[in-house]
């Protein structure tokens, strides 16, 4: 029998579900996408960087340079059968730049969080095997993986674009466990290091001037890992034993094939609608977590954006209004219960330059993850994404009168 209480963390996430696998998939997005249900496979990169589909980089206007930096704040309310607890996390969320190579191609580089870890299990009471004695453990985890990504898009012919991307995934997941057994205190620090490459492709096709379809696929890959471990044991506050190990091999972590299909539509002037579906084939990785199994994941998203004028002469005509919805079936099943989540989003694009070519993007997401059942908890989360998206023209000639 064990009892668990959750405490506050100050990492990029405070989700207790970041305990599983490599952590929770990051809520970070570049530019407008977080307000559009985290979707946009068929959207271009003509105004802002769209990191979801490498083919979009072919839409960057000639001689243009795009830059984006973001910040993410998160409030989580975790509920189980005994209590509710609030957690706050905030951090840098992305850095990206993109530019046109020529009038038919563009490329970009970005770094964004890939997974986030930030959990704390406080006061885990367990029995010493073979006796009536109890011991208490406190376990905390932090860190996550980053995605350093290079995108390239090329327009094969008018209305049809292809793209390729390469990601270098890397990062550290740290866990600390403190165990108290009578007068003996055990402290265990483990740092798990992962890295690996991943490759993907995409295309976009303009059916006409109102409808575009987008497609992406990311190939399955393996992330190699090593572990450093440092253990200290004290008795009556006196250090009695110390163990320091480094470079220990750990199991590789498999990432699945991911397939995405999106539709973009412009039904009326100023309105853009995006709808995406993604399928991540976790079941094919044939791997398990300590307390669950991986299952295929489906992600649905829909978003809409309205702007009064393409190039408005008045300031308010360049403001962009956005809203979206996202449903994620989850990829981990615990006690035959899949940990799914959903979220609603709203946002604004606030012009900070003439004609609205550069924007301050602000979005708010509200959603739920998991259910109160057995060892599972329900997590209600609120996210605020703030992105500064800048656009400029390279090699512009300056004329003097």
Describe each region flagged by the PLM:
Residues 8-401:
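Subset of outer-membrane beta-barrel
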Residues 3-7:
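Sec/Tat signal peptide C-region and signal peptidase I cleavage site
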